[in-house]
Amino acid sequence: MFTDLLHSSYFSLFLIVALGFMLGRIKIKGLSLDVSAVIFIALLFGHFGVIIPKELGNFGLVLFIFTIGIQAGPGFFDSFRSKGKTLILITMLIICSACLTAVGLKYAFDIDTPSVVGLIAGALTSTPGLAVAIDSTHSPLASIAYGIAYPFGVIGVILFVKLLPKIMRVNLDQEARRLEIERRGQFPELGTCIYRVTNASVFNRSLMQINARAMTGAVISRLKHKDEISIPTAHTVLHEGDYIQAVGSEESLNQLSVLIGEREEGELPLDKTQEIESLLLTKKDMINKQLGDLNLQKNFGCTVTRVRRSGIDLSPSPDLALKFGDKLMVVGEKEGIKGVARLLGNNAKKLSDTDFFPIAMGIVLGVLFGKLNISFSDTLSFSPGLTGGVLMVALVLSAVGKTGPIIWSMSGPANQLLRQLGLLLFLAEVGTSAGKNLVATFQESGLLMFGVGAAITVVPMLVAVIVGRLVFKINILDLLGTITGGMTSTPGLAAADSMVDSNIPSVAYATVYPIAMVFLILFIQVISSAVY
């Protein structure tokens, strides 16, 4: 009966997942496999003939990659601009060192070219690479070599990623917190203080004439004239002895002091008719609109003092493009704030709702894009493939944010759930597929081909660590993402993802993966045609 159940793919799938989680929770000297343990259980089941359908694996793969891209999209382009050149250079070193290792060992052990390109594709777990290897060599030896190198290509990257922080004695959680503080430093913390108008050059001049926001970056949120407190407009006139309250970074507040007058600590109390509220942007029509275009002061008599996005307070400049889920701190009279709330949406439930149409449409577009075949010449062509197509489309859609009524984003809990589900399906299928031929390939081909494949897997990662840490001084979270992306290893990314509560590895992975995929395909084609 149990044997019959094992032939049921859905029973085997959930049994593999359950046993994988049990194994993943076992810690030895503080090291555990976490979700990566699923693939080891799957390898064992695959050896005994259990099969998970390929379609389930592909379904899981597109879910996992799409959720990675949707989350990483906005950070991807920022990362590409700030440190993209360094990460791409390390990625090129990974691909080059893998191919040079393979070619060197080919001549050392007299291995045929089809087997070498198959070993490269397997060691870097690249199915598009295998397709190119078979197409370029017209030999079944490429797929056999791929099967030999693939299991260690999966397991080796997972173990390397798990062990690297221990070997380097780096606490990933502490490193993530340090990088978060560093990131926040790029967006200075906003403060509030009051000023007494003592600079004669601003007496009897309006805020529009003074142009304080453009000159200092600070936002003037309240004014006290005589004993009356109000929310200033562009036409509000300053008088000697007035008090104003402003919000901004320490630098902008200091600059405002030079412009206005004496700086004092404290806050001006709100008038009884005024309130301050935190409002959520959840209305589709408002996404990507600039804050200044809303004319909140003119239309509602309200002022935005700060915008909170992804845990960071942003200065509410007029050209700030609003994003879904932004939290705006608004000051104004009660009725005015109600009007702003209606304009923005302010519906917390919408943040947790999951709209499956953007997910389905995004994956469809990604799969179609992956089918494109870009020809550079009669002998050289490139196709993004399933993984590359879905990832690149998800990155672009996430960065765009909104197309007409469609919002290309997901709530955090929904993203994590779909990502974990996709990953488990993918690992279970990949593991059983690799496990069924594991022993047979060892018996037929011996340890030589396996050893060469293992070297092609390990050497590039060592090169990346040495160059990345010693030459470029890259933090370990970016390095883990770059290694897994450069090795085109989705299971490796999953291992890194499970070790730390940060999306830094995912952003680095998304930054370099498309580059790695293109270079790997080009190198395999060159080796297939030029190396004998």
From Swiss-Prot:
SUPFAM superfamilies: TrkA C-terminal domain-like
Matching Pfam families: Asp-Al_Ex (PF06826), TrkA_C (PF02080)
Lineage: superkingdom: Bacteria
UniProt topology in membrane: Multi-pass membrane protein
Gene3D superfamilies to which the protein is assigned, alphabetical: Regulator of K+ conductance, C-terminal domain
Subcellular location: Cell membrane
PROSITE patterns attached to this UniProt entry: RCK_C (PS51202)
One GO BP: potassium ion transport
MF terms in GO: monoatomic cation transmembrane transporter activity
Keyword terms: Cell membrane, Membrane, Repeat, Transmembrane, Transmembrane helix, Transport
Transmembrane segments: 7-26, 30-52, 59-77, 87-109, 116-134, 139-161, 356-376, 386-408, 421-440, 445-467, 474-496, 506-528
Location of the RCK C-terminal domain: 179-262, 263-346
GO cellular component, one term: plasma membrane
NCBIfam families noted in UniProt: YidE_YbjL_dupl
Family: Belongs to the AAE transporter (TC 2.A.81) family.
Name of this chain's protein: Uncharacterized transporter BT_0500
